[in-house]
């Protein structure tokens, strides 16, 4: 009888401990859901940042100038991988990346109730979308022109869709190799570079004597490199400004959405465009304010 009583008391003790533990866990979850928002942004010159701030209205025009009102407290990352890592490691973080680079390590929020997907980008329902452009000068080599022809071909656009991006060209023709040789330098957007690596790999299977060097350092850097003739082709993950496009030819190689991402433990599932602008400009600073 005494032994049975001791077991009962032990069970009550464990049960109490469990309730305390659950209570603490619940409190932690609540704290995570209502904590201070950690804004993760891309660097100045990033095409993803340029497109994101323009679409959300964070980028304001003041006469001939454009003012980026991204929160001064934002943690700046210089690559897509940097944003993914920062969001994955912080329960209260929020960032933005290329939809084609989205992995299961983070969670994408719906925007105004619309999920980011190939279909919602194609039909225009998903508001955060942009083209992946390439730029080149009028004196581009025969090899460079052939590589661009491959990108726009049936085989090239198949590489685009195989890598979770959206094809820019619906009417395409078969690419026929001319068995060229030589070297190309492609510079620019970190969002475009992962796709460009796959395109270069597929092109080199058709042209084994070709070397393609790819440098990921931001859209603006890609445009500058082509203008300064230190690169053959530039990668740009946004629309070009009239000034940028003056002396260059550009064309879209793919379409892409911009996914707004949070930690997988975050309870939020959607955000409005208005809330998004307020979050990334520093006006809305806690998760409990997002409805």
UniProtKB/Swiss-Prot annotation:
Question: According to the UniProt entry, where is the signal peptide?
Answer: 1-21
UniProt similarity note: Belongs to the PstS family.
The record's Gene Ontology cellular component field reads: plasma membrane
Membrane topology of the entry = Lipid-anchor
Membrane-spanning intervals of the chain: none
Lipid sites, type N-palmitoyl cysteine = 22
- What is the species of this protein? Streptococcus pneumoniae serotype 4 (strain ATCC BAA-334 / TIGR4)
Alphabetically sorted, this entry's keywords are: Cell membrane, Lipoprotein, Membrane, Palmitate, Phosphate transport, Signal, Stress response, Transport
Q: Keyword Manganese: yes or no?
A: no
Which GO biological process annotations does it have?
phosphate ion transport
User: Which cellular compartments is it found in?
Assistant: Cell membrane
Q: Where is the lipid attached (S-diacylglycerol cysteine)?
A: 22
**Miscellaneous field:** Overexpression seems to confer resistance to penicillin.
Major localization class: membrane
> What is known about what this protein does?
Part of the ABC transporter complex PstSACB involved in phosphate import.
One Pfam family in the UniProt entry: PBP_like_2
- Return the protein name: Phosphate-binding protein PstS 2
Record bears the keyword Membrane: yes
What do we know about what induces or represses this protein's expression? By phosphate starvation.
Which PROSITE patterns does the UniProt record give?
PROKAR_LIPOPROTEIN (PS51257)
Per the record, the domain of life is Bacteria
Q: How does it assemble?
A: The complex is composed of two ATP-binding proteins (PstB), two transmembrane proteins (PstC and PstA) and a solute-binding protein (PstS).
């Amino acid at each position: 009888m005494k032994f049975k009583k001791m077991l009962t008391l032990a069970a009550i003790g464990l049960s109490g401990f469990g309730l305390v533990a659950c209570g603490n866990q619940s409190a932690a979850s609540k704290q995570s859901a209502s904590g201070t928002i950690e804004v993760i942004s891309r660097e100045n010159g990033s095409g993803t940042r340029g497109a994101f701030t323009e679409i959300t209205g964070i980028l304001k025009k003041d006469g001939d100038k454009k003012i980026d009102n991204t929160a001064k407290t934002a943690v700046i990352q210089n690559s897509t991988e940097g944003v993914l890592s920062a969001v994955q490691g912080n329960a209260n973080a929020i960032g933005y990346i290329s939809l084609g680079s989205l992995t299961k390590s983070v969670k994408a929020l719906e925007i105004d109730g619309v999920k980011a997907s190939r279909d919602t980008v194609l039909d225009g329902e998903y508001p955060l979308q942009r083209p992946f452009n390439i730029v080149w000068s009028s004196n581009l080599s025969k090899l460079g022109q052939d590589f661009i022809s491959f990108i726009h071909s049936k085989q090239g656009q198949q590489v685009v869709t195989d890598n979770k991006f959206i094809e820019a060209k619906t009417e395409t023709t078969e690419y026929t190799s001319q068995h060229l040789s030589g070297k190309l330098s492609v510079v620019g957007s970190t969002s475009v570079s992962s796709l460009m690596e796959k395109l270069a790999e597929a092109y080199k299977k058709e042209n084994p004597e070709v070397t393609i060097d790819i440098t990921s350092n931001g859209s603006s850097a890609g445009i500058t490199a082509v203008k300064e003739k230190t690169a053959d082709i530039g990668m740009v993950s946004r629309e070009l400004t009239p000034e940028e496009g003056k002396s260059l030819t550009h064309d879209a190689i793919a379409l892409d959405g911009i996914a707004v991402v949070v930690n997988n433990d975050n309870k939020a599932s959607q955000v409005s465009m208005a809330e998004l602008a307020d979050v990334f400009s520093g006006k809305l600073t806690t998760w409990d304010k997002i409805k």
